[in-house]
Amino acid sequence: SEVKKAIKNEIINQLDFRFLNETWPEFDLSKPDGCLPTTESLVRVIWKRLKSHLPLKSLRLYENPKLWADYKGNAMDAYLTVQTHFAAAHRLAREDLPQNENEKIFGKCARPNGHGHNYIVDITVKGKINPRTGMICDLSALNSLINDLVIEPFDHTFLNKDIPYFADCVPTAENI
């Protein structure tokens, strides 16, 4: 197809098994507008190289299965997503309903002693690509925030009992 041909010719054949810092002029740091080939910068440069060949709406580039960047053609705006996980137990039930009603509404999640899930969380931040660093945020700081605000508080807890917010709120995926 034309899509595969454009991607192969304009991107894959030029980048595969190459040292990114020296492959394209956009990554030449001796030039005033040269940038580092971070995931965020790379997805933006790929967009610029493909836009004359394809009717792009958005572009996603995976650095690895748990880290990717999205670009939608808007100047230096990009999105960075970190995927992580935590394990937690919960019981979905309303105290004002009998057990059989809770089971009809919430299924196995209404078991009297609760049960557990392995939750996968995608956390996406939007920002401007910094011309000096090629990044939209400090990835180490973002990972620390995710750990402090999501993983540590929720991992291996019984949400209904260990997280005060869920004392009066049913811990559905939407509420978590």
Language-model-detected regions and their locations in the chain:
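Charge-rich, low-complexity N-terminal segments
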Residues: S1-I176
